[in-house]
């Protein structure tokens, strides 16, 4: 059942979008009367198109709700509105470019994507549509968003990703740099950090404001302020609640500028200058050093999962509903103390049935995306709900996980993917900036600057 297959990023984007759309009405209320006053006004002209206040209200509401769900600080309304409008401008420019280039997404492709998304959630398309509509998400809106995501994905593939190449020499250099010339003597580093977001493609005014904020925080940190409190109250990274503590990391897992800073710092010291990273500004404090575990400690690692499953195929006298229900019944019996392996040997239609459904240790990329995503969402010992893949319906149980140094080929694959992703992100940012510079954009509300 093992099969290498890349998971389309558009499916993940739509999965996140479905949750945001469901929350839109409640979030929009938080924007107050200002949004209502702008609802029918034009807030931006983008080439020969316009963005209305109503569209801006809806999108800003989604973003505000998403931040609330993540327990992240929500910017003031004017600031949020400006940031969201700039995002919408960039999106609109790309949609126009795609249409001008003749990129079209037919209904069959949209339906296929939605079907795959529904299957990844263990539902039929009708059930998935029903769930979204019950949450207040109009199906027509979700379908339209799916078409836009697919269009922009195809545009990026044509203009950027499809032109990225990674040579064997780059792969070899990457792996060598991960290990380092004296890997056995390398030290793992523990940092605290404060991250202030400022993507390179953000408006220049936003970048300058972010740098000013970061500079002020840096001065406080250098003056002896409690770094942990500063991080908790100001950092925009996911680890802000932990005081920005990154834990011990090998130098290879940290940005090069951060590693360079460590060479000049003693534990407890704050780096005297800001560190510019692609997404913003970093303030870092070296907490501690420790001896690494040797040459292999810095080598690319993979997380392997020991997993077993029960597969029921659809079609051979068994409908979709029957397969799901049978697996749901088996799951209930296993949760009540039944023997998973025994059920697998009796009912599974996979070649692993004779081993009690045991697939052994699975490395990333060795299963179909829907299976891997469900597997990755499980804790050790946990059993999934019935999951649909191209093979049928699965009941998945994770037995344990381990971290291992991959084979030479796996290390090469990891290196190639990391290099390609880094090059693609930079190329995309450059391409998007050029596209924006060649477009006509006029803002109709105050407090918004051009998205340089």
Swiss-Prot record:
Catalytic activity, as annotated: [protein]-peptidylproline (omega=180) = [protein]-peptidylproline (omega=0)
Keywords noted in UniProt: Chaperone, Isomerase, Periplasm, Repeat, Rotamase, Signal
Pfam family, one: Rotamase_3
GO CC annotation terms, alphabetical: outer membrane-bounded periplasmic space
Annotated source species: Burkholderia lata (strain ATCC 17760 / DSM 23089 / LMG 22485 / NCIMB 9086 / R18194 / 383)
Residue span, PpiC domain: 186-288, 302-400
InterPro entries in alphabetical order: OMP_Chaperone_SurA (IPR050280), PPIase_dom_sf (IPR046357), PPIase_PpiC (IPR000297), PPIase_SurA (IPR023034), SurA_N (IPR015391), Trigger_fact/SurA_dom_sf (IPR027304)
Name of the protein this chain belongs to: Chaperone SurA
Domains as described in the record: The PPIase activity resides only in the second parvulin domain. The N-terminal region and the C-terminal tail are necessary and sufficient for the chaperone activity of SurA. The PPIase activity is dispensable for SurA to function as a chaperone. The N-terminal region and the C-terminal tail are also required for porin recognition.
Signal peptide: 1-28
EC identifiers of the protein: 5.2.1.8
Cell compartments where the protein resides: Periplasm
Reported function: Chaperone involved in the correct folding and assembly of outer membrane proteins. Recognizes specific patterns of aromatic residues and the orientation of their side chains, which are found more frequently in integral outer membrane proteins. May act in both early periplasmic and late outer membrane-associated steps of protein maturation.
Main location: periplasm
A biological process term (GO) from this entry: protein stabilization
An example Gene Ontology molecular-function term: unfolded protein binding
């Amino acid at each position: 059942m093992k099969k290498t297959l890349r998971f389309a990023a558009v499916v993940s984007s739509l999965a996140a979008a479905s949750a945001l759309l469901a929350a839109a009405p409640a979030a929009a209320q938080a924007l107050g009367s200002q949004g209502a006053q702008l609802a029918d006004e034009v807030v931006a002209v983008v080439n020969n198109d316009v963005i209305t206040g109503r569209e801006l209200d809806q999108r800003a509401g989604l973003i505000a709700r998403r931040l609330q769900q993540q327990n992240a600080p929500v910017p003031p309304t004017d600031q949020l509105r400006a940031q969201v409008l700039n995002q919408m401008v960039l999106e609109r420019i790309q949609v126009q470019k795609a249409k001008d280039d003749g990129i079209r997404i037919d209904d069959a492709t949209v339906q296929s994507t939605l079907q795959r998304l529904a299957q990844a959630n263990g539902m039929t398309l009708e059930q998935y549509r029903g769930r979204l509509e019950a949450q207040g998400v109009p199906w027509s809106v979700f379908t339209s968003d799916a078409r836009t995501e697919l269009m922009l994905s195809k545009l990026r593939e044509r203009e950027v990703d499809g032109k990225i190449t990674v040579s064997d020499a780059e792969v070899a250099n990457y792996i060598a740099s991960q290990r380092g010339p004296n890997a056995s003597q390398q030290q793992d580093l523990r940092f605290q950090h404060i991250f202030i977001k400022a993507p390179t493609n953000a408006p220049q005014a936003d970048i300058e404001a972010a740098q000013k904020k970061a500079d002020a925080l840096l001065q406080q940190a250098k003056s002896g302020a409690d770094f942990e409190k500063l991080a908790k109250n100001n950092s925009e990274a996911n680890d802000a609640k932990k005081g920005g503590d990154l834990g011990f990391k090998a130098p290879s897992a940290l940005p090069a500028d951060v590693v360079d800073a460590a060479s000049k710092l003693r534990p407890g010291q704050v780096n005297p200058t800001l560190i510019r990273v692609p997404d913003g500004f970093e303030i870092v404090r070296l907490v501690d050093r420790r001896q690494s575990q040797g040459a292999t400690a810095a080598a690319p690692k993979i997380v392997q999962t020991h997993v077993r499953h029960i597969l029921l195929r659809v079609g051979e006298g068994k409908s979709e509903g029957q397969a799901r229900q049978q697996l749901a019944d088996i799951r209930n019996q296993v949760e009540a103390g039944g023997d998973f392996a025994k059920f697998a040997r009796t009912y599974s239609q996979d070649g692993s049935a004779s081993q009690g459904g045991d697939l052994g240790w699975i490395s990333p990329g060795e299963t179909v995306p829907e299976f891997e995503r469900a597997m990755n969402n499980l804790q050790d010992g946990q059993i999934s709900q019935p999951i649909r893949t191209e093979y049928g319906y699965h009941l998945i149980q994770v037995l344990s996980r381990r971290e291992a140094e991959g084979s030479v080929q796996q290390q090469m694959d990891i290196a190639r993917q990391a290099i390609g992703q880094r090059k693609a992100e930079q190329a995309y940012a450059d391409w998007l900036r050029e596209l924006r510079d060649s477009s006509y954009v006029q803002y109709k509300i105050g407090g918004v600057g051009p998205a340089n």
